[in-house]
Amino acid sequence: MSFFTKLFASIGIGSARVDTKLERDTYRPGDKVNGVVEVKGGAVAQNIEEIYISLHTKYIVESDSKEAMKKTAIERIRINDPFTILVDEIKEIPFSFTLPLDTPLTYGKVKVWIATSVDIKNAVDPRDEDFIDV
């Protein structure tokens, strides 16, 4: 494994990738969200410290007769223990959580999505976003 391969992986080139796969795309507040996070190893073995699933929304705020879009995280869940992903290895980490009852309904410009973030020490952290209908 060359120095350059490790260097490129640390800046995201040839690094591990992440893809979150949900059981479905439409939910109601209080529903169980089931899915799997697929981590695919890159050109070098890397230590995966943490994987987080977080629920986000974008909503409209009105102030002084002006509208602005705001983003916020509703919930954040850690789904793994630290592990090493090997070159070209594929690992699937299952997860499940209950969609909070105060999750806003999606309509118009109001959006809800599940973001996945992977913490890789000394490297660019891969991310994934999956929009859902509520």
Q: What are the roles of these predicted feature ranges?
A:
Residues 1-134:
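N-terminal onset of structured domains
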